[in-house]
Each structure stands twice: as structure tokens, then as C-alpha cells.
Amino acid sequence: MMKMRWLGAAIMLTLYASSSWAFSIDDVAKQAQSLAGKGYEAPKSNLPSVFRDMKYADYQQIQFNSDKAYWNNLKTPFKLEFYHQGMYFDTPVKINEVTATTVKRIKYSPDYFNFGNVQHDKDTVKDLGFAGFKVLYPINSKDKNDEIVSMLGASYFRVIGAGQVYGLSARGLAIDTALPSGEEFPRFREFWIERPKPTDKRLTVYALLDSPRATGAYRFVIIPGRDTVVDVQSKVYLRDKVGKLGVAPLTSMFLFGPNQPSPTTNYRPELHDSNGLSIHAGNGEWIWRPLNNPKHLAVSSYAMENPQGFGLLQRGREFSRFEDLDDRYDLRPSAWITPKGDWGKGKVELVEIPTNDETNDNIVAYWTPDQLPEPGKEMNFKYTLTFSRDEDKLHAPDNAWVLQTRRSTGDVKQSNLIRQPDGTIAFVVDFVGADMKKLPPDTPVAAQTSIGDNGEIVDSNVRYNPVTKGWRLMLRVKVKDAKKTTEMRAALVNADQTLSETWSYQLPANE
């Protein structure tokens, strides 16, 4: 009887231990905090030269065998596939599976991959390790798994929703972006992925971040759908002081568009992953900043307290704006960040980097706090990341928003009706919105405009646009010193009522 009683108690204790055990961000945070108190150890590459020195076309030949997708034999809507190391993805990351009772390392095997025509010694790849992973989910069709998340390289990750193709990227953390000292790129060194149940509609991923001057613990809850949403929680620790910390960084590409046309003839009218930075400031103001591809590094800062949101958007999705059948820029998502809680005082910062082609990401946006704690102290950030093609949801419903910004040579119509250039630069800015459409065409809409010390507004007028049922602002600007940037702002008003978001533009230097 005593033996049976002891056995029952042991079973109950086991059940209790199993039910109470749960992996959490705190488990990762303990590692991150411990690392922050030690010296940084750079990751060591174990990659044979044939993989490290390969070109992109060769790396593309290494394909994951889809019939060996992780969780393929489980009744779960989520599947995992892995990236092989190669090129600059030359250090392995650890990937673990979290179940209800344990954590298990997902071991690398070359059998996961088809190496195509890549000649290699099989013995040299048997213990290499993964470079990253991707998440598959039946987002577009119930009977087909589509890739919805890619985590590969440093702390980069890309996410898409239904009917979208990969475009801009998000990152875990940015350090000293655009500073003369050079940028530091933290990397996710280890991941823990919760095994989803058959009925789960979300996937939870934990990550350990490491770099010479910072460590961090991250939790990503991925919720796929028409808009795929990623709920992010991070605990960040500094090893040493940094010049600038970039929180919730986004990375994108802008080559050319109507505000900055292509310098060479191109059948594509626009070429970009994103065409503007949108900000919902802490004071309620909405700001739209069209992107540039400048000839020199450019940084724009928007100081505020407790931002309500910001993101890099792809406004205007008509195929005729892009005309690219291969890369489908019209299907690339916008990314919107919604902070949770108060983030305090700081700046939303935009960095624009010169590029000659679309293969380089040259746009970065992030939040940078004014005050940073001493090394070792914990910083907490929570936010949601929404990847969407529904930009109508990403601005105030009662505010008009900027549909397009077009640049032209400024001119004056002569008495003979011929337009004569007058040395100015002209901007055409179209505002549209649901509430604006309801206004009678004869509403006395006006513009509040301003320009920095390096420019002068020569002419400004607003007229009704019967095509868009909105209003068009036309500006002619005189630049004093073409070697300097020129800042300008504008918003539409009706008497004392603000009708639109603020158009905030920086004319790059030497244009």
C-alpha cells in the first residue's frame, strides 16, 4: 500500500513538473545578461573555401529538400526549412526545438540539402551547421505551404503576408548606423522555436543576439494572414557604450521614382521596395517623408516623445507604376511598427545611402532613444510589426495622405504659351483621402508651407484634382547652394482645420 502511494505521488510530481515547465524569454535573457558581463567572442567560421568563396548563383544551387521539411510528419500547419552556409553566410547558428517538456537541438545534416553542381568534399560538410531558417505556412492556399518568414544573416529577417513577395527586411538591433566610426551588426547566434500544436495559428521563436557591444533576448510571435503580424519583445543589454542604438530597425531599397527619376532611360517608371517613411508622432501628427537615393550619405531625424508608430511603406501599387514582371515591386509589403508602452524621448531616424543598382539595401529607419542605460542594465522594448499591402490602414482615417510626389524642372508660362525654365525646381504633391473626397471642389483648400535656410519658395498653389477627388499642391523652389540639402514641409488646411498629414521632404545635395 505504501509502495502504491509513493508511486502515485511520483506520478503526480512528474505531471506537475511537466505542466509547470515552460520555456520563455527569461531563459534567453539569462544567457544574454551573462554574455553582456563577459568579453565578446567573435563567431568562428567552419566553412570550407568552396562555400565561402562561392558566387550568389552557386549559393542559389544549394536547395533544401522540401520533402525533409521539419515537422513534415506532424499535423501542424507550420513547417521549417533551413539555409545552408555559403558566401558571407559563413558562420553557423544553433537552432533548437522547444516542446512541452524539453529543448532539443536540431542537428545539421547534409542530407537536408541538394547541392546541385557545387563540387565539394562530403566529409567537410557533415558537421557544418545551419546559416538560418525559413518558416512555411499555407497562407495563400490550404493545400500549399508558402514561405512566410526568412531568418538569415546578422539579425535580419523578412516576413510576408498573403499575396505578397519578399521586399524590405527587419532587424533585431542596429548599432552606430551612419556614424563615422562605422556600423556594428549584431547577429542572432541561437534560436529556439516552439513546436506548434495542430490547431495553432501562430508560431513563437526566441533568439539570442550578440555583438561586440550588445547582447539581447528576443521573442517573436508570428501570426500569418492577409497581413502577417509579428509581436516582438526584446530585452537588450549593453556590453559597452554605443554612439547610437537603433531599435526596431527596418532596411529597404529605393533606387528611383517620380520624386527622383532615373538618370538613365529605363522602362520601369519606379524601382523600390519602399517609397516613403511614415511616422505617427507622439503628439498625434502624421508625417510622410518620400525616400531618396542621394549622391552622399543623408540622415533625417524626427525628434519626439513616445512615438505611436512608424514604418517604411510602398504607397501606390498599380502595376503600371513599376512594370516589372520579374521582381513584382507592386506586391512587396509595407512594414509598420506599433510600439507598446511608452518609449520615452528619442528620434525616428532615416538613413539614405547612395546606390547604383537595386541589389543594395540603401534605406534604414529605426527609433533611437535619447538616453541609454549603463552597460549591463536591461532595456525592454515591445512592439508589433505588420507586413501589409493595405496602406489605407496605415494613416489617420480622417486625414488626407500623400498619393505621390513628382519632381520637375520649374518653369513659367510665357505670353506665347511656351513654358520657360526659370532656374527653380518644381514639386507636384497629390493629397487624397476619404474625408477629402467629400469636400466640394470649390472648398478653399490652402497650403501651409515652409523651407529651410538653403531654399526659397518662389510659388505655391493648391488646386482641386478631379481625377483623384483630392487636391494637388504645386511648389516652385529656388535652391541657394546646390551642394547642401534643402528641407521643406507642407500640409493642406481649410481655414484653421488641418486636412492632411505633413509632407516632409529633403532635396538631396548636388541635384
Curated annotation (Swiss-Prot):
One of its GO terms (cellular component) is outer membrane-bounded periplasmic space. One of its GO terms (molecular function) is catalytic activity. Residues 1-22 form the signal peptide. It comes from the Bacteria. Keywords: Periplasm, Signal. GO terms for biological process: beta-glucan biosynthetic process. It is found in: Periplasm. Pathway: Glycan metabolism; osmoregulated periplasmic glucan (OPG) biosynthesis. The keyword Signal applies. Involved in the biosynthesis of osmoregulated periplasmic glucans (OPGs). Belongs to the OpgD/OpgG family. This is Glucans biosynthesis protein G. It comes from Salmonella typhimurium (strain LT2 / SGSC1412 / ATCC 700720).
